[in-house]
Curated annotation (Swiss-Prot):
Cytoplasmic side of membrane: 1-31, 77-98, 157-176, 244-278, 349-356, 416-433, 489-501
Keywords: Cell membrane, Membrane, Sugar transport, Symport, Transmembrane, Transmembrane helix, Transport
Organ and tissue specificity: Expressed in source leaf blades.
Gene name per UniProt: SUT2
Family according to the record: Belongs to the glycoside-pentoside-hexuronide (GPH) cation symporter transporter (TC 2.A.2.4) family.
InterPro entries per UniProt: MFS, MFS_trans_sf, Suc_symporter_pln
UniProt GO BP: sucrose metabolic process
Subcellular location: Cell membrane
Subunit structure as annotated in this protein's UniProt entry: Homodimer.
Pathway info: Glycan biosynthesis; sucrose metabolism
A single Gene Ontology CC term: plasma membrane
Segments in the Extracellular topological domain: 53-55, 120-135, 198-222, 300-327, 378-394, 455-467
Protein name: Sucrose transport protein SUT2
Residues spanning the membrane: 32-52, 56-76, 99-119, 136-156, 177-197, 223-243, 279-299, 328-348, 357-377, 395-415, 434-454, 468-488
Amino acid sequence: MPRRPSGGGGGAGPAAAAVRKVPLRKLLRAASVACGVQFGWALQLSLLTPYVQELGIPHAFASLVWLCGPLSGLLVQPLVGHLSDRIAPAASPLGRRRPFIAAGAASIAAAVLTVGFSADLGRIFGDSITPGSTRLGAIIVYLVGFWLLDVGNNATQGPCRAFLADLTENDPRRTRIANAYFSLFMALGNILGYATGAYSGWYKIFPFTVTPSCSISCANLKSAFLLDIIILVVTTCITVASVQEPQSLGSDEADHPSTEQEAFLWELFGSFRYFTLPVWMVLIVTALTWIGWFPFILFDTDWMGREIYRGSPDDPSITQSYHDGVRMGSFGLMLNSVLLGFTSIVLEKLCRKWGAGLVWGVSNILMALCFVAMLVITYVAKNMDYPPSGVPPTGIVIASLVVFTILGAPLAITYSIPYAMAASRVENLGLGQGLAMGILNLAIVIPQVIVSLGSGPWDQLFGGGNAPAFAVAAAASFIGGLVAILGLPRARIASRRRGHR
């Protein structure tokens, strides 16, 4: 529960804390694991919704598979953050956060191997390799791997953001810079991951991935995940070896005995009653933002394959068109990540000039306009005459790629500002940064559960496409933008003196 800050004397006072300020280059290295994690996340976002439909799960139920992510994140990230808060820095050679970062990365590596080889393992369990058949064994293996992958993602990113908050000592400016570094590495991981997903020749480099139960598209997925493991191992090692964690946590955390056994969920949900209005506004805007983002995350490449390229993973006669659309969608997401990276670089200047709340609100309104544009493109494409080859008109493809690209700017803001605002606003409440990130995570995963449960029925109710989910996304994004502009501070956030804790 929150604790009143104490003055604490001695040599480890404010002056000493200022001397021990972590250089920005070390913060940059500490954030590098985001590249490895996001490389796999990009593959997951661009390729796994189409892949699970190839295994036999209908489009209407594909979103339910993604329940694994928010349900695991609902407890895993707050629990990991809580546990890492409770570890004394000197109790582990790697400190408080880095053991969880390393363990989460190991879980991701095991998960992508499981997902990548799910078709082969399903064949061992008796699946048929007849085209169009439902592969129950592969689906079960896939779901286990998918669940483990989301557990690993949550177990890695939460402690990493808390690690950065520890290193910046909750200085608002340095915290925003650290989170911008994190977003920059996420952008780099996205660019590499989506470029990997857009390339169709990985099976030629890893020929052993093609098997009787794993076609060329499956082998490309498998090969991409093997590359993911290599990048993940390298970036995790860089982060873990980047900098020693602070040994002095301040009196508010040092006074907390490691033997105290408060019930985790009680502390998590009990902390809500201490939240001030600005904290609640951050959580509300975060929730609305993710109601906007999650339909796009679920169906971006599927939308390109179905609505733009008029393909389907279920119909062998148009499966190739679907895969062409998925690869074009991956290319669009790569362009999205380029703009995401550029926005991450200039984000600190934007926040200093206009204020974090206004920047966040404007980005949400831009999101809403992009989702409306996707609805317009869907309607136009549906009513156009395509050439006999079935290739969509160039103008439609370019318009789709432009929308995908523009969405990179608000995505960079979503990956940075909410975490920086939460980290700076919970300090006065006396909450550990790990628990703070876990609480913010609740505002992310609960909307994802709502969208995962609702998007399938919405789509079926209105004809089986992706348009209804995007309409909900546009409305939620617009409302979130208005709330951010009206309810979050618009003044520039000045850098605080380090003279108190």
